[in-house]
């Protein structure tokens, strides 16, 4: 595509993770494996929670939504990345870039807020158990779910508005494997200081505050659990520990990316790869499958499926 001073950029060229064919092949295989685990794993969690009438506590509503967000989030980047590995020229249209950027921040922002809601749920369940049924009633839970989806939308639309107002008339090469605000704004034909500052406040500072708030809330819960002498102490400790792991895995890369928008770092691509492809696998592998009730329900569901298949084969 020829680019002159008066030419409007209509597409971006993605430079990808690496130019090495051997490394690209290795990464392609690894990402394909991750993706084939992420989608079935998260949808199995959703189906298990939806089909078991015993999993009605607020925790399972939140886990089901977390699985849906993870599956959707991985769908935004991974499939196109796999196709690009097989293409000589990795091109994404301007509209496609904006669309990808919107859904990344919509789903990512919603997931961050969901983790805050889940921390509040654990605080009520562990530190204020007598108030659990009144505070975390179905109406309140659905209101919080609506609020976090709206919060993710507002966060994302701010990013999109920032991009749509920028003129692009020069270079069109993105040094990454997907579209994100940090790389796109560097290609605009105007001074980016104010935009990058707004980006720090909208993404970086919000991510950092959520991260610190989550760590503080789980620190309070862990202190409360350690002082308690109850049969469920070990289970509560284990639950909180896994959630702290999820928080570190999700917010660590996000803080690294969005708190330093003014300069490119050598580790940017690997951090982005972890955040967009590998992290969504953490929900089924670390989070939900540590829940005994979900595992038991999943085993019953799979057993019924096997029995139905065997019965069908015998009858035919």
From Swiss-Prot:
Q: How does it sit in the membrane?
A: Multi-pass membrane protein
**Looking at the keywords, is Ion transport present?**
no
- Specify whether Transmembrane helix is a keyword of the entry: yes
Q: Give me the Gene Ontology terms describing cellular component.
A: plasma membrane
Q: Which Pfam families match?
A: 7tm_4 (PF13853)
Q: Any ranges marked Cytoplasmic in the topology annotation, and which? A: 50-57, 121-139, 220-235, 290-316
> What subcellular locations does the record give?
Cell membrane
**An MF annotation (GO) of this entry:** olfactory receptor activity
Keywords noted in UniProt: Cell membrane, Disulfide bond, G-protein coupled receptor, Glycoprotein, Membrane, Olfaction, Receptor, Sensory transduction, Transducer, Transmembrane, Transmembrane helix
Any stretches that span the bilayer, and where are they? Answer: 26-49, 58-79, 101-120, 140-158, 196-219, 236-258, 270-289
What is this protein's function? Answer: Odorant receptor.
Which PANTHER family does UniProt cross-reference here? OLFACTORY RECEPTOR
Write out the similarity annotation.
Answer: Belongs to the G-protein coupled receptor 1 family.
Name-wise, this protein is: Olfactory receptor 4N4
What organism, scientifically named, is this protein from? Answer: Homo sapiens
Instruction: List the gene name.
Output: OR4N4
